[in-house]
Every structure is written in C-alpha cells, then in structure tokens.
C-alpha cells in the first residue's frame, strides 16, 4: 500500500482525536462493548475519505494517531495511541494552544493505550520482552492483534439479517451493542452514498456508470444481503474497514 496524506486538516484531525478521547474518558464506567461503541461513533463515518476517480468500490479511510483498531500495522490495537505518530502530528501545528492540546492527549493515552497497559502488565527484565526482541525467550506482543471475520455469515444474512439473528438470542449488553454497531455501519453506508453523489457532480460521462452502480449497490447492501458479486465485494469491504 502507498501512504497518502490525511484528507482532513490538522485542526480537524485534532478535533476528532479529542472527541474520541473524551468519549473514552466519559465511558470508563460502562461495559467495554458500550464503551467501544461510543468511541467508534466519534470516528465513523468521520474518518472516511472522498471517492477517488478510479475507485470501483466505496470506502477509503484515514487513520489517526489515536483511535480504535485491530492491527498494529494500521492504526493500533483496541483503544490505541501511536505515540511517535502523535509527536509527528504535533509538529504540523502552528499555535502553542493546539500543541498543548496534543500534550494533554499524549498524557492521557500514556495511561490508557491498550498496548502500553498490556506491556506494563506482562514485561519483565528476564524472560518477557517486546516484539521483536531476540534477547528474551518470550515476546509479549506476538499476535496481540488480529481477528477472523465471519464473511460467510455476513453474505448469507446481510446487515438487517444479522440484526434479526442477534435479536433472536437472549438480550444482553454485548448483543445490544452488536446491533447498535451494525446500525453504525449502516450510517457509514449512508455517508458513502453521499460521497458517491458528490463524486457524480463533476464526473465524466464515462465515469458515471461506475458511480451509479456504486450508489445502487450501496443502497442494496444497507439492508439486504448481496445478490451480485459487486454487492458482495462492497459489503465485505466496508464491513472490514470498520470491524
């Protein structure tokens, strides 16, 4: 993949990271599934980028130094702060007031970054080191990240079908949050439809066919299970981006 600059201004990025941090702070007493959902609402669909001229599927996403993720290679694991990226981001700001706001974020996440908490709990001087450090027999962060998504079930049921399946079980906080997370994904799809319509305004006639297909299929997968290969690709892609 080729790194590209964030589409949003440094001020917009700072505001999003502050909103995420505030949601994380305010939801400390909640169940972890509810807390995750509240935090996700501050970054989705806000972090999605505009449709580009050669896109055949909707869904481009910016990653900030603070957020939520499932892999260390892009963003971070769970509630994360990539500290060296946050320090680099600070250099993009001009005012001392904005830099002080970044310092406040840095201080908060030193105590709350998932990887930092994990390492503080398990690292020791003799046997357990960080990934990758061959000085130790055991590497603490090996496979800390990653998960397997059930794409077959996603294709078989679609988003509304998954909601129905979840609601058929005895309700609890986790399952309720799962339903709300799927609703958030539908809001992400609504935003993608808006972005496609924006792209259509200046599109050449030869490009309109691609964008119209994209818009139609987004409308389908918002509530229905996919019926075509393109719809299946679009659903799995947008689902994976926010998973």
What are the residue ranges of the model-derived segments?
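Long, non-catalytic protein-protein interaction scaffolds
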Residues: 1-168
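Structured, charged N-terminal subsegments at the starts of enzyme catalytic cores
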Residues: 156-243
């Amino acid at each position: 993949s080729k790194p590209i600059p964030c589409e949003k201004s440094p001020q917009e990025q700072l505001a999003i990271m502050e909103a995420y941090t505030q949601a994380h702070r305010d939801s400390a007493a909640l169940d972890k599934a509810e807390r995750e959902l509240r935090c996700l609402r501050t970054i989705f669909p806000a972090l999605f980028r505009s449709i580009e001229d050669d896109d055949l599927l909707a869904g481009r996403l910016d990653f900030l130094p603070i957020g939520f993720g499932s892999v260390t290679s892009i963003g971070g694991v769970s509630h994360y702060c990539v500290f060296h990226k946050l320090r680099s981001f600070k250099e993009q700001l001009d005012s001392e007031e904005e830099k002080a706001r970044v310092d406040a974020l840095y201080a908060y996440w030193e105590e709350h970054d998932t990887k930092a908490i994990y390492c503080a709990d398990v690292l020791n001087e003799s046997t357990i080191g960080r990934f990758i450090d061959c000085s130790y027999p055991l590497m603490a962060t090996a496979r800390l990240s990653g998960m397997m998504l059930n794409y077959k079930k996603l294709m078989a049921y679609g988003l509304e079908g998954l909601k129905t399946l979840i609601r058929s079980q005895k309700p609890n906080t986790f399952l309720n949050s799962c339903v709300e997370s799927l609703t958030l994904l539908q809001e992400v799809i609504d935003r993608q439809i808006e972005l496609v319509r924006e792209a259509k305004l200046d599109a050449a006639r030869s490009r309109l066919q691609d964008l119209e297909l994209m818009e139609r299929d987004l409308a389908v997968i918002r509530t229905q299970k996919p019926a075509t290969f393109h719809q299946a690709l679009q659903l799995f892609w947008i689902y994976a981006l926010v998973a």
